[in-house]
């Protein structure tokens, strides 16, 4: 772990977070020193040099199961879907979510808007991994991230895939290096793992591991954000897809850095059943309910690391919309607040300008009729230290705000904004609630993205 210990000042945004770790001191706490990884999964991170300026850092990730997996994925809604997205979609459809063995990912080039040639490049990446596995049917999902509109140096990648396959390992260091290999403007690799049990198999201990990348162009459905989750629990493909869809809607699709949606987003989950036990195949089972809670909570923790690494970000903000007639309306309001440049810049400037929050609530499109009524809307700042909330607006009436306390709350790295649509503790509309996580906008964000291609 010594390689991950060097501290630097400011927001360092090399194209990929280097292994000799130019990681801000405040971010080092997010790098795990150990992990509990699922049985039967092997991983590797290999240097290819996809981006010409990358002369030594790993930029090719390979995740492989020793046995066939159930697999599911959620993809970007951007109309310009990248070649690897198209290829992975086709593979999952043809295999009906069964028999998937690997995921191969390159960073440094998105392979998006690259025509037929780019599509063939993505196909050939998957084929090369399948050849290494000795498989004749497409069994590999493909992901790419980086600059849009440029072709991959496909010969270099194909030449290095056998090396990546030969270097597959199950150690914590291998998982960490693999998580690092998918980074672009991230300042740290994002990796989590945990163990769990299921009601029907209390004697079996299962593991769940996940890695993700993303720091900018983040406002899913989904954004320039990749993620792979692996578990050794036995889950049928149909159950796995619905579990992932639910988890992603409340995690990776509930975060925002800058409001942009990319061409490449993919979150995939692989389940190989290597830890044994009864398979999860029914949405009505106790195991399914438990797995839904476990996967959603895990995905939320993983996705929040993306927000904490937002380009130029200085704050991690939770917005909680309560007492809505339905979840979708609450989520739309939370999303609108999270992507408001005026809200984000006010938070960066430590300005308790709650009028900007109220404005975002008011112009939210698509909410159910009667959801937003000014006379019963309340807005508060909730400090993370457990102290009393700072009420800004109560039932449509402005409070006398203690500006000194507001400034003190906004100086903290973490902050929660609470929007109550019911106008009281219990509310008049019901108990539906949605949560979104986002970061502020700073001068650094402009600098980072102005220099992106260099």
Curated annotation (Swiss-Prot):
According to its UniProt record, the EC number is: 2.3.1.35, 2.3.1.1
Give yes or no: UniProt keyword Transferase. Answer: yes
- Which keywords label this protein? Acyltransferase, Amino-acid biosynthesis, Arginine biosynthesis, Autocatalytic cleavage, Mitochondrion, Multifunctional enzyme, Transferase
Could you state what the record's PTM comment says about this protein? The alpha and beta chains are autoproteolytically processed from a single precursor protein within the mitochondrion.
Query: Major location, coarse class?
Result: mitochondrion
Q: Specify whether Acyltransferase is a keyword of the entry.
A: yes
Instruction: Name the residues annotated as site: Cleavage.
Output: 223-224
List of residues binding substrate: 184, 213, 224, 311, 449, 454
The site annotation (Involved in the stabilization of negative charge on the oxyanion by the formation of the oxyanion hole) covers 145-146
Single Gene Ontology BP annotation: L-arginine biosynthetic process
Q: In which pathway does it act?
A: Amino-acid biosynthesis; L-arginine biosynthesis; L-ornithine and N-acetyl-L-glutamate from L-glutamate and N(2)-acetyl-L-ornithine (cyclic): step 1/1; Amino-acid biosynthesis; L-arginine biosynthesis; N(2)-acetyl-L-ornithine from L-glutamate: step 1/4
Which InterPro entries would you find in this protein's record? Arg_biosynth_ArgJ, ArgJ-like_dom_sf, ArgJ_beta_C
Q: Which residues are the active-site ones? A: 224 (nucleophile)
Reaction(s) catalysed by this chain's protein: N(2)-acetyl-L-ornithine + L-glutamate = N-acetyl-L-glutamate + L-ornithine; L-glutamate + acetyl-CoA = N-acetyl-L-glutamate + CoA + H(+)
Q: Which Pfam families match?
A: ArgJ
On subunit structure and binding partners, the annotation says: Heterodimer of an alpha and a beta chain.
The job of this chain, per UniProt, is described as: Catalyzes two activities which are involved in the cyclic version of arginine biosynthesis: the synthesis of acetylglutamate from glutamate and acetyl-CoA, and of ornithine by transacetylation between acetylornithine and glutamate.
Misc. comment: This protein may be expected to contain an N-terminal transit peptide but none has been predicted.
NCBIfam families in UniProt: ArgJ, PRK05388.1
What's the protein here called? Answer: Arginine biosynthesis bifunctional protein ArgJ, mitochondrial
Please give the organism.
Aspergillus clavatus (strain ATCC 1007 / CBS 513.65 / DSM 816 / NCTC 3887 / NRRL 1 / QM 1276 / 107)
């Amino acid at each position: 772990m010594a390689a991950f210990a060097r501290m630097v000042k400011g927001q360092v945004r090399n194209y990929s977070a280097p292994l000799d770790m130019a990681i801000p001191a405040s971010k080092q706490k997010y790098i795990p020193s150990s992990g509990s990884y699922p049985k039967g999964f092997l991983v590797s991170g290999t240097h290819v040099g996809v981006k010409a300026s990358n002369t030594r850092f790993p930029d090719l990730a390979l995740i492989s199961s020793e046995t066939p997996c159930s697999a599911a994925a959620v993809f970007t809604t951007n109309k310009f879907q990248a070649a690897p997205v198209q290829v992975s979609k086709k593979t999952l459809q043809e295999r009906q979510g069964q028999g998937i063995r690997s995921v191969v990912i390159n960073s440094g080039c998105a392979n998006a808007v690259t025509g037929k040639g780019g599509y063939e490049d993505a196909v050939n990446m998957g084929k090369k991994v399948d050849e290494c596995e000795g498989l004749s049917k497409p069994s590999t999902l493909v992901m790419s991230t980086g600059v849009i509109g440029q072709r991959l140096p496909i010969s270099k990648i194909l030449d290095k895939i056998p090396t990546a396959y030969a270097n597959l390992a199950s150690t914590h260091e291998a998982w960490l290096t693999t998580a690092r290999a998918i980074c672009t403007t991230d300042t740290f690799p994002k990796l989590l793992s945990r163990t769990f049990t299921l009601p029907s198999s209390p004697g079996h201990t299962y593991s769940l591991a996940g890695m993700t990348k993303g720091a900018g162009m983040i406002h899913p459905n989904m954004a320039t954000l990749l993620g792979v989750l692996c578990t050794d629990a036995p889950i049928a493909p149909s159950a796995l897809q619905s579990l992932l869809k639910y988890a992603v809607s409340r995690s990776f699709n509930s975060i925002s850095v800058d409001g942009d949606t990319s061409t490449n987003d993919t979150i995939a989950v692989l389940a190989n059943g290597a830890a044994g036990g009864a398979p999860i195949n029914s949405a009505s089972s106790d195991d399914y309910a438990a797995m839904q809670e476990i996967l959603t909570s895990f995905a939320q923790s993983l996705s929040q690391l993306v927000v904490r690494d937002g380009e130029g970000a200085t704050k991690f903000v939770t917005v909680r919309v309560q007492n809505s007639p339905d979840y979708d309306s609450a989520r739309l309001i939370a999303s609108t607040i999270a992507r408001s440049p005026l809200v984000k810049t006010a938070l960066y400037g430590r300005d308790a300008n709650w009028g900007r929050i109220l404005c975002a609530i008011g112009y939210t499109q698509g909410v159910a009729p009667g959801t937003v009524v000014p006379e019963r809307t309340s807005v508060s700042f909730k400090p993370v230290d457990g102290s009393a909330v700072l009420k800004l607006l109560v039932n449509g009436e402005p409070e006398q705000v203690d500006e000194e306390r507001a400034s003190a709350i906004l100086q903290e790295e973490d902050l929660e904004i609470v929007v109550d649509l019911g106008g009281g503790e219990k509310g008049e509309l019901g108990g539906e609630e949605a949560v979104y996580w986002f970061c502020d906008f700073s001068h650094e964000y402009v600098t980072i993205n102005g220099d992106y291609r260099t």
